[in-house]
Amino acid sequence: PNGIPKRMTTLSDFEAEPHFSSDGKSVLFVTWNDETLGSIYKVNLDGKNLMKITQEKGIYRTPAYNSDDSKIVYRKESGNGDQGYDYTKKTGIYLANADGTDPKRVSKNGEFPIFSADDKRIFFQTGGSFFGGLTKKLKSVDLNGKEVRSHFSSKLANRLVPSHDNKFIAFIHLHKLFVAPFVMNGSEINLDNNTKSFNVESLSKNAGINLHWSGDNKNVHWTLGDEYFSKSIVNNTTDPFAKTNLVAAEPVGIKINLKEKSDIPEGRIAFKNVRIITMKGNQVIEDGTIIINKNKIEKIGKTSDITIPSDAKVYKMLGKTIMPGIVDVHAHVGAFRNGLSTQKHWQFYANLAFGVTTSHDPSVHTAAAFTLEELQRSGHLVGPRMFSTGFILYGAEGDFKAVVNNLDDARFAIARTKAFGAKSIKSYNQPRREQRQQIMQAARELGVNVVPEGGSNFYSNMSMIFDGHTGIEHNIPVNPVYKDVLSLWKNSKTGYTPTLIVNYGGMNGEMEWYQKSNVWENKTLLKYTPRYVVDTRSRHRIIIPEEEYKNGHILTSETVTALANEGVKVNLGAH
């Protein structure tokens, strides 16, 4: 437990979702490569005998062995806007020999397949995971895909994970971890943290993901941020309805200790004879030179005043303009999908192409977002430096919502996101003011910024300013505003990110671009953005009178200008 993680392979592919063999000597895992697509591999723990198991390209997920390692199950996933749609027909749960031969589909839907204790059935979960349906179910089929049974149903759960001996089930419900006996009474059982007919116990005061069981079924494991947790379970399943303890002790956490260096380029670069827009007011240097040493600007000024070091690689930029990188603090950069990361993230390239060098995404899938962040910072992905909030602290219905009824609830919600490295959280439509105030208090204690969803509710927006939120995301829906609002905002420290392409209380600014320009012909946009994304939004135009725009995002912009003139910090947010 105190060791240092060591990579087992030398593949250039991205690797994910490892599963130990029952003898503990090898690991199954999936890979993704943007050019050759996905596969399933097997490798010994010493890194030897690497073997590709699948023969057909595809998007493969969560492989698992049976008890004697002679069979495997896995999921073939449908396509998506990041990984594409090639080789994604006949998706579902598959059974195959351990060497990948004789694959057959046993279910058209479901995910997270595993074998039953006697290897005669295959369990799988339906309803998705985060951002899936409100109700998840644990089902099973026989090895021919017949005799479908539904064992558990759980509203607002995220994961349902039976132990290998099928005596227990661990589950995640609204980010919290629980364990219960695996009751088999021939019918579907409703399962949640308030189940009374049999014992359901909490595994931890904190949140967790990647829930799984030890090979001997004596421990439940999970991760949170950079820690790996274990908790012992008492085997009392001779009577699953007995109200005896299931959990033996407090969870034990260890640091994973996987450390990657931030990517810092080597050498010097000189951009010569370039027009430079500086950050000194309105200053523009018409014939300038910029010298970059590794990842920092070393010199900047008029070309005639700068001596270029002999070791610098010189780029002559006559006719070009260099400007400071754009910081987009409300940038949705493709971190919503619950799946494997691509090696070239097109949303990153598209943002870079239009000058965005720093992005902050205020609504994401936590694991996806911080994976992208760390891959970018370590040099495995090209993209803007990225920050994010993790899951929004959602006040409405959803399997990812944050129930906040007291200060401890707020601390729990923020701590689970901060564990991944979040420096901000998004309070999203928490309906009551005291809920938002509890989030603010917890955020102050934990040193995290709070950027709330505006929600097109003027009075909530004003209370957010009174209560000291870091900034308001999206525009306030009332325009123009007068001295009372201007004075309040001026005397606060709350910023404003109006995201003008989405305009509450009027026509969205995005639509004006489609009406007045041929967006689908923009070469820079099309170089990095999939054609279907551009065409579906831009080719079928909505034509509206000009006054709709003037009374929409233009009027909002006039209020933004008035606030900026009063000293309110206005942020760029492209949404």
Residue ranges and their predicted role:
Residues 282-323:
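Histidine-rich, glycine-flanked metal-binding segment
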Residues 152-157, 195-212:
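Conserved blade-ending motifs and adjacent loop-strand segments that build the rim/top face
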Residues 320-378, 398-399, 405-408, 434, ...:
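Metal-associated gating/positioning segment near the N- to mid-region
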Residues 422-464, 502-503, 550-552:
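Divalent metal-binding pocket/active-site signature
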Residues 347-367, 383-394, 418-430, 440, ...:
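Divalent metal-dependent hydrolysis catalytic cores, especially in the metallo-beta-lactamase
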Residues 197, 230-268:
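Pro/Ala/Gly-rich low-complexity, hydrophilic intrinsically disordered segments
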Residues 1, 8-15, 22, 30-41, ...:
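A flexible loop/linker signature enriched in serine peptidases of the S9 family
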Residues 413-431, 477-575:
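Active-site neighborhoods of metal-dependent hydrolases
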